[in-house]
Amino acid sequence: MGSSIFLGLQPSPSHWLKSSVVIHEDAPTMFYGTQLIMSPPTKNKLKRQSQLLSTMLSRTLSYKYRDLDSTFCSLGASDDPSELSTQLSAPGVLKVFGDSVCTGTHYKSVLATGSSSAQELVKEALERYALDPECAGQYVLCDVVGQAGDSGQRWQAQCFRVFGDNEKPLLIQELWKPREGLSRRFELRKKSDVEELASRDVDTTTAGINAQARRLQRIRAKGTPALTSEAAQSSPPTRLRRTVSETSLSPAPSLPEAAQRPEEPVPEAMRYSLYQCPHLLLLQGYSQQHDSLVYVLSKERHTVGQRTPSSKPSISLSAPDILPLHCTIRRHQSPEGGPAGTRLVLEPITGASVSVNFSEVGRNPVVLQHGDLLSLGLYYLLLFKDPGQAQPLPACALARLGAAPQSCRMCGAVLRARGAPSLPAAVVRRRSLLLEFEPDVEDTLLQRIMTLIEPGGDDHKLTPAFLLCLCIQHSAMHFQPGTFRHLLLKISKRVRDTVWEKTKELAEKQAQLQEPISWASFPMADLVPDLQHILFWMSNSIELLYFIQQKSPLYVQSMEEELDVTGSKESLFSCTLTASEEAMAALEEVVLYAFQQCVYYLSKCLYVCLPALLECPPFQTERRESWRSGPALPEELRRVVSVFQATLDLLQQLQMHPEVASQMLAYLFFFSGTLLLNQVLDKGPSLSCFHWPRGVQVCARLQQFLEWARSAGLGAPAERFFRKLSCTLHLLATPRAQLIQMSWATLRVTFPALNPAQLHRLLTQYQLASAMGPVSAWEPGAPDGPEAFQSEDILESYENPPPIVLPSQGFQVDLEADCVEDSIYQHLLYIRHFLWGLRGQASPDSGPAQPESIEGLYHTIPEGHLEGHGCPLANRDPGRVAVETAPPHSLPVTGAPRAQGPPGRQPTRGDRRGSQAGSLHTDSSCMLTPPSTPLGLEPAGPSWPEPSGLCGRAVLDGQRNGPGGLPGAVLEGDAIQDAEPPAEASSPSSSAEDFCYVFMVELERGPSGLGMGLIDGMHTPLGAQGLYIQTLLPGSPAASDGRLSLGDQILEVNGSSLRGVSYMRAVDLIRHGGKKMRFLVAKSDMETAKKIRFRNPPS
């Protein structure tokens, strides 16, 4: 029997049944358990229906693909012979067998309910066996599966499971059934006997087979090198798969010997292959899953291409721009003969993109030389090495490798040497997305990310998932495995706690509603704000779950290959994998719980408004076709549509995965169709729709609803779950004279969705409502006679809802995407600045003069002065260019000073493995914020520090081709090169253009407002249009934030750009922007701040 975890979920109001969810850790299927079935109506109909609703929503979900398992269906009307401890004919009586406790006694009966715990049942059973209940700790209740045998034969137990003290035996009995041919009974056993049995049954195989699997997995990951030509004659050559370069090769035995001798040295024949045969070393690839690191060229001819059903190249590359046959590499023997005369010739195929040393080769064959760089398509870059030609790489090859562009680690922009020519467009890379932090600020960072986005705002709703995935990526690549493991568990726990708090608050609000609940006391508008938070974290949890599921094994494999741990290496990575599985299980639980809660409350809304559709007043049929353009929807139908429309809008606004959104709406359709059909079949003639005129009206109402569903793109699920109700209403809308002439067989063909029992029930109630005598033609025929009188088949069950399956594709969080949403990137910049603030608080005495305090946020650069062109201003308007480069005179005078460190001190950067780090020059202009930005301005200082270096130039206009800009559209995140040489240091405006830093700040209005005085730049010596900060009130929100300083320019207010906006209009936007406001601010240099401080004298 699989282990189980029982979680009580719904903190519902007192008159709504609390549902529970059973999460199966290893069950292959997903099922929905229930303890209630629908019965004829009672006086308290609302309470009964709520119980049905709650139990319908008790279900499980798995990120694996699962189908509904018929073995978990509820028991039938008769007693189940496989259950020896319970009988349906005697509910509430549990037989506890105690052969091993009291000799000569077969069993004792105790009373139990579904909520009875195993510990309490042990106490009751001991009392029935005349034993002391105080000794309950010496006994355990066991779930025993075995064969009862025929009469006279003894019970033969095959396996048993000990119940935990707080487990619910009857609930487990309902959900887990023994397989066919076996029976189950509950036994009372002594704990000492159970422990003795457990000590004898020692598992000696699991650890061995798992160790064997790990060894085989490591060998498969490292691959088996191809043999030399001598060895290849006796065995076919094999590809080197996922090896490492020749400088870090470790001995690896062949596959058959790996299981027995994993630590033996590699045979000389295999090592000789890589050190003597030419090979291609992968420098840049496309797919981590499919690319090899080394391709050994040991054959006479190699084909390079993309593997297809009709093409199977010897070197398979997976990039989309690789042709099925891209090029061939063949061995060419020169006329001189001998080994020295053997060369490899690259022969490109027509139409294939092939470059050697960054030069297109066209159709001409090329003789490969040791150290050549091969570019295949846009993604693959390989280094050709031929140990037979030369051992060290030639100087020209090293120069080409050194010419690869460096990138700023903060913004991903390409850096180039000062005065060097512009790089070709093909080499310019997009900015990388990184979020670097230290382990000591991990908790603070997670808390800030969790509270960063308001679900009701305009920000990208998947920003938390995106930022948390960046945290996971950084931790996996730079921290120890233990830190990575703890981070996964922290993230899953914080998400789970957040969802639980939001649902708890919603339940407390719902508990205050007075019964009976009506539409007036339970409006959808009041429910939407609370559902926003639940759906918000459900959407982010789905993205996080998929990311961890896909990336965590790759990260663990990378750690295993790179980290050198002795002794407990296997246990360390085993713990990491276990933590990854626990995090995925927790996130899966969040998705399930959030799904259940949302459907629960939405179904309550529908339960209130759906019955009115069956009792709707007359309506104007001639306006039926124009209901979209005016208030033609009747009030009863408008309420139902408003619930579905609000749900659809919420799912789209919160960027829920489309497959999960469709499943949630399918649930609501299923519930609505089942509820209305059961009411028609249950209430019968008491409903006005059984009279023909009202039946026509109700049928028309349903058609209007289906029309709305089709217009919203939900036609298929709506028609599926309303099919039986539609057949029922069409029958009631059929004229009486026409209906009387139909025979039973004709009715079965005309209304095929109804089973015989439901059709017979409808016809019987139709006769009562119409006061007409029995109609002989409506009597069930011989084939349908027995089924027509089965009363249990009349009402539809809530136990067969549409399945819930997590999606496997279509996710939006992709850290390797070419570009990212502007809103997400703005928040990434804010989080980086937030981390800067934390570093400043951690070392307030060090100041900017100690670069070691900000270690890890610099880009490591080789010897030489570099200047970067990047750090763009991420524009909120995706239709506009994010960054363009302009000549110096066209740039607004904005800038900021750089923090200068003491001479001779240079920061070093170490990685997670403690590798060596040398003294390196750093591009200090890549800092997101000067560590000490002054709040006020003191012009009496002796001198103003001049900025140096360059990390980006931003133009705030939206033209695609500004003066001096590059022709054509500029993609967001691309690094742009100057069309003109940089201005000389003596230029009056160069100091204001060398630095442009843009950040986001959120301020909450205080008693005295925001506390900053603004001025139009045209009325200052600056003479530039724009809104600038002239004064900061001490103690105000603006001053307390710590990032704003005099002279800073306000670019946006709550997402609205101030470009071209008048001063009065900009001030009005700030004055009426609400209590919490968000500003996009550009830092200014000291020269600009001095000019902003003074106003022009009146002319």
Swiss-Prot record:
Keywords assigned: Cell adhesion, Developmental protein, Phosphoprotein
Residue ranges of every copy of the Dilute domain listed in the record: 525-792
InterPro entries recorded: CBD_Rasip1/Radil (IPR037983), Dilute_dom (IPR002710), FHA_dom (IPR000253), PDZ (IPR001478), PDZ_sf (IPR036034), RA_dom (IPR000159), SMAD_FHA_dom_sf (IPR008984), Ubiquitin-like_domsf (IPR029071)
GO CC terms, sorted: microtubule; protein-containing complex
Residues that bear Phosphoserine: S235, S245, S248, S250, S422, S432, S915
Record region (Disordered): 221-265, 868-941
Domain of life the protein comes from: Eukaryota
FHA domain sequence ranges: 302-377
Record-linked Pfam families: DIL, FHA, PDZ, RA
UniProt-listed GO biological process terms: signal transduction; substrate adhesion-dependent cell spreading
Positions of the PDZ domain: 1000-1085
Domain spans labelled Ras-associating: 90-193
Biased composition (Polar residues): 226-237, 916-927
Subunit structure as annotated in this protein's UniProt entry: Interacts with RAP1A; in a GTP-dependent manner. Does not interact with members of the Ras family. Interacts (via PDZ domain) with KIF14; is recruited to the microtubule network restricting its interaction with activated RAP1A.
Function in brief: Downstream effector of Rap required for cell adhesion and migration of neural crest precursors during development.
Similarity remark: Belongs to the RADIL family.
Stated name of the protein: Ras-associating and dilute domain-containing protein
Gene that encodes the chain: Radil
